[in-house]
C-alpha cells in the first residue's frame, strides 16, 4: 500500500513560503488595481453587460510573487553544504538547474508582460518562448546532455531498444516550451479558465511528483515540487480574483509564465511525455483550432463565445466570410469537419447569399455546440471538469497502459 512520503526540510520550507505567497497574491492584486487602470492596462469583459474597466495583465503580480518566493528559497536545498562535515562536494549541477530554470521563467514573464503592453502579433508570440527557452536548453546540455530515448515496444524491431535523437531532442524540447506557453493562451477567453486549467495541471503534477518520490528519480521530482508548489498557491490566489465574475484579467503574462513553468519542470524533471499527457484538452484544442490558426479558414481577432443578453448564457461565436474567398483546402476542411459534426456551418448568409459562417473552432465553442447555451460560470466548471478527467486518464496511461509500450 502506498504511504505518503516523508518530505525533506527544503520542501517544507517551500510549502510555508508558498502559503505566504498565496496570501501576498490575494492581497497585492486589489492593492495594485488602480495602478494598472491608471496605466491603461485594463479592458472590458466582452461577455458582460457592464462596461466596467477591469485591470489586465495580473499574471505579472502572480509571477513576481512566485519569483520572490523562489529567490528567497534558493539557499535551502543546499543547507547541508553550509556545514562542511555534511557536504562532500557542492552540487553545482543542481544549483545551475535551479538558476537556469528561474532565468527561463523570469524571461518569459518579462516577454509576456511586453506582449500585454505592446499587443504583439501571433508570429511574434511564437518567437518569445523560443528565446526564453534557450537558457533552459543550455542547462540541459551542460548538466545532462543525454539525447537517447527508449523506443516503444511496437517500434523496437525497426529502431532497436535505444535511439539517439541528437539535436532533434533539443528541437523537441524547444517546441515543447513553445507549445506549453501558447496552449494555455489559445484555450482562454472566459472567467477563470486560464488560471483554473493551470491550477488543475499543477495539482496533477504535484500528485505525480509525490507518488514518484519513492521511485528511482526522487531528486528530479523534488526539483519539480520546488516550482510546482509555489506555482499552485500563487495561481490559486490569482484565481480567487479571476473567478466569475472576474475582477481582474490574467493577461498573456500569466499564460506564458504558466506554460514556461510547466516546460521547465517537464524538461529538467525528465517527464516531458507525462507532462504532455496532462495537456490532453490543450492538445485537442490546438489541433481543432489549427485550420483557423493557419488561416485555412478565416480567423477573427476574438474567438470567445458571445453573450445572449436575454438569457444571460454564452452561445457559439462565428466566423463569417465570403464563400468564394475560401481556398480549396479550407473548403475541404470545412466539409470534413461538418460531416464529423465538429462545426456548425450556415451557407448562403446575407441578402445576396454570398457569405458562409461557421462556429469558431475552439474547444469552448465545441462544448457549446454539444450542450447548447451555458452560463459562463458553468462553462468554466465544465472545462475544468474535463481537465480533471484528462488528468485521471493520464494517470491511467502512466501507470497501466504504459506496460504495453515500455518495460516497467
UniProtKB/Swiss-Prot annotation:
Catalytic activity of the protein: a di-trans,poly-cis-dolichyl phosphate + UDP-N-acetyl-alpha-D-glucosamine = an N-acetyl-alpha-D-glucosaminyl-diphospho-di-trans,poly-cis-dolichol + UMP
Name recorded for this polypeptide: UDP-N-acetylglucosamine--dolichyl-phosphate N-acetylglucosaminephosphotransferase
Domain of life per record: Eukaryota
UniProt GO molecular function: glycosyltransferase activity; metal ion binding; UDP-N-acetylglucosamine-dolichyl-phosphate N-acetylglucosaminephosphotransferase activity
Lumenal face of the membrane: 1-10, 79-91, 144-166, 214-218, 270-271, 401-408
GO biological process per UniProt: dolichol-linked oligosaccharide biosynthetic process
Organism (species): Cricetulus longicaudatus (Long-tailed dwarf hamster)
Gene responsible for this protein: DPAGT1
Residues annotated as transmembrane: 11-38, 59-78, 92-118, 122-143, 167-186, 193-213, 219-242, 251-269, 272-293, 376-400
